[in-house]
Amino acid sequence: MNIENKEITSSWFTNLRDLLCKEFEKIEEEYAQTKGLKPAKFVRSSWQRNGGGGGVMSLMKGAVFEKVGVNISTVFGKISSEFRNEIPGAELDGKFFATGISLVAHLKSPLIPAMHFNTRYIETSKSWFGGGGDLTPFYPEKNETVKFHAAFKEACDKYDSSYYPKFKKQCDEYFYLKHRKEPRGVGGIFYDYLNNGNFEQDFAFTQDVGKALLSVYPEIVRSKLFLPWTAEQKEYQLIRRGRYVEFNLLYDRGTKFGLMTDGNVEAILMSLPPEVKFN
């Protein structure tokens, strides 16, 4: 396993965490100032994994972000024998290293889309990058969807013109609730097992995916920061959040990987919304 690759990827995910948290706190401050409120701040808690490594969970509950969590983790060790065949390259000895960032934002306003993002770097006897970002509006708007996709397309096109259509398709297929026969949101990009034999290029692409998210999502939030919404719209948001819960517990690879590798349960399930209704 390449020690330098581990260090620079882990360092980037920490840096991206700091940039995202700073921007989200800034949005809370902007809103709080106009409403005479005390702005919310992220609360951080560290955790250690018994088999090796650990992470830091950053959680904020505010007036704009009902619940937003930004997790970073770097874990290593051995995957238990019953799960080794599910992780490429771990079949023989089960050794693995994984570092990454995951982010889920649930907004108070039903007019502002929920958002999920993660990027990661994993080493077994093989190595690869994965991740992506997707948007889940409760009241979709075409211009907003186009803007979100355009940010990721620009990041993709810098490296390979085939990336965006391929990763968009993978996102549409991945964030699909098979039991309901419906998509979770309006998509984005999703990639996994990315290894083109050029670590620097694959890492640069993964960094640009993070920068794309940082540029576009705060803009979307700010555009609807002060729009009024109704009790009926909030009720609909709570019901639709149920789809988020269903996907994360039934299909999400990150949830499964975290549980298979004895990750921190609170951090793994951080993506669940703070309030939801099942009718």
From Swiss-Prot:
Q: Which UniProt keywords apply?
A: Cytoplasm, Heme biosynthesis, Metal-binding, Oxidoreductase, Porphyrin biosynthesis
Record's Gene Ontology CC terms? cytoplasm
Give the subcellular location.
Cytoplasm
User: Which superkingdom heads the taxonomic lineage of this protein's source?
Assistant: Bacteria
Q: Site feature Important for dimerization: at which residues?
A: 179
Q: Where does substrate bind?
A: 102, 118-120
| Enzyme's top EC category | oxidoreductase
GO terms classed as biological process: protoporphyrinogen IX biosynthetic process
Q: Which reaction does it catalyse?
A: coproporphyrinogen III + O2 + 2 H(+) = protoporphyrinogen IX + 2 CO2 + 2 H2O
Instruction: Identify the residues that bind a divalent metal cation.
Output: 106, 116, 149, 179
Q: Belongs to which family? A: Belongs to the aerobic coproporphyrinogen-III oxidase family.
What is the official name of this protein in its record?
Oxygen-dependent coproporphyrinogen-III oxidase
Upper lineage: Bacteria, Pseudomonadati, Pseudomonadota, Alphaproteobacteria, Rickettsiales
